[in-house]
Regions:
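Short flexible/disordered coil segments
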Residues: 5-7, 13, 51-52, 75-93, ...
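Conserved acidic, metal-coordinating active-site core of Asp-based
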Residues: 71-223, 231-235
């Protein structure tokens, strides 16, 4: 753009939500975190350094062939220092053991134990209800509501990262935040309340759907297009059903259910991010194996097999049409 200050001055940023809806950005690039305490922000700020230290402690036993300097570099690269969702990503480490499923599974177990240690440390500071772990990709939730790790298998590394997230920061709740903001701009009122945010929202998908049905007139619902890249479906070990998960499945299901309720043809778009961006099942052969199944209630309307570049081109085209219209 030539001028680094122009986007902020002219309001060129894309407004929206990040980190499961807990971080808001306006078109001037200003960030806010409704419902988040200063103690929580302080713990999150220190978390990446702590994650790196814990990795350096635990990796030598799993990767004995690496020296101290290599391990330190690997640990640093694995920690993603995002402000409100610090993450450990194993993709770079998995590249060192590409065909060693046993070591890959051991790394996944190590990662889970490490992140649970971080949860315990937060609880020790009086923040026991503040955080949760988001596993990506996952195999849905267990009986305790915890996201299941997708174990590495031949040809599929499974879970690659775990995010340390604020409670309430789920995309389904973020969808309601966006709906509330849209109706406020369009109709001048906030049906879910002026201070509604993901931390005050219900966590259960059925409760979120019921809240919309109770508070928002169906005729005020906009057409929604949901875009995701992480949806999984794996046959259960006993062969009697499917373990469905993926970090985008929940909000895409809710978006679909909202459309069925209000009579809108909401659309679900799935982007193939298996081209080196992350380790995910590919759309290439058209079977969508590992992504969906014949009994899947989530209906995918559009596939973008060429990945992020195809999505960006589509988004630009959509923006041009909107501007012309």
């Amino acid at each position: 753009l030539g001028d680094p200050d122009l986007p902020k001055r002219e309001g060129c940023y894309l407004p929206g939500l990040a980190a499961g809806g807990v971080q808001l950005q306006d078109r001037f690039g200003d960030l806010s975190h409704p419902g988040v305490s200063s103690a929580e922000m302080a713990f999150l700020a220190a978390a990446p350094t702590r994650m790196e230290a814990l990795l350096i402690e635990r990796l030598p036993g799993l990767l004995p062939q690496l020296g101290v300097d290599d391990l330190a570099e690997l640990a640093k690269a694995a920690v993603l220092d995002t402000q409100v969702s610090p993450t450990i990503n194993l993709n770079g480490i998995f590249e060192l053991v590409p065909a060693d499923v046993t070591t890959q599974q051991a790394l996944q177990t190590m990662l889970s134990e490490l992140m649970h240690q971080l949860l315990a440390e937060a609880a020790g500071q009086g923040l026991e209800e503040s955080f949760f772990l988001h596993v990506a990709p996952n195999l849905g939730r267990d009986a305790q509501g915890q996201e299941r790790i997708k174990p590495a298998a031949a040809g599929d590394v499974g879970t690659t990262d775990i995010q340390f997230m604020l409670t309430g920061s789920i995309k389904e709740a973020g969808l309601l935040v966006l709906l509330n903001q849209h109706i406020q701009r369009r109709w001048g009122e906030s049906p879910l309340g002026e201070t509604f945010n993901v931390r005050t929202a219900p966590h259960d998908p059925e409760a979120l759907l019921a809240l919309v049905q109770q508070r928002i007139p169906a005729e005020r619902m906009p057409l929604l297009v949901g875009v995701g890249d992480t949806v999984t479906s794996t046959a259960s070990a006993d062969g009697t059903g499917w373990l469905r998960g993926g970090s985008d499945r929940g909000f895409l299901n809710l978006l679909q259910d909202l459309g069925a309720w209000c009579g809108r043809s909401n659309r679900v778009v799935l982007v193939d991010s298996s081209h080196g961006e992350v380790d995910r099942p590919s759309h290439a052969d058209g079977t969508l194996r590992g992504i969906t199944d014949p009994e899947d209630p989530l209906r995918i309307d559009t596939l973008m097999p060429d990945g992020p570049e195809q999505y960006i081109a589509w988004f630009r085209q959509l923006s041009e049409r909107r501007r012309v219209g």
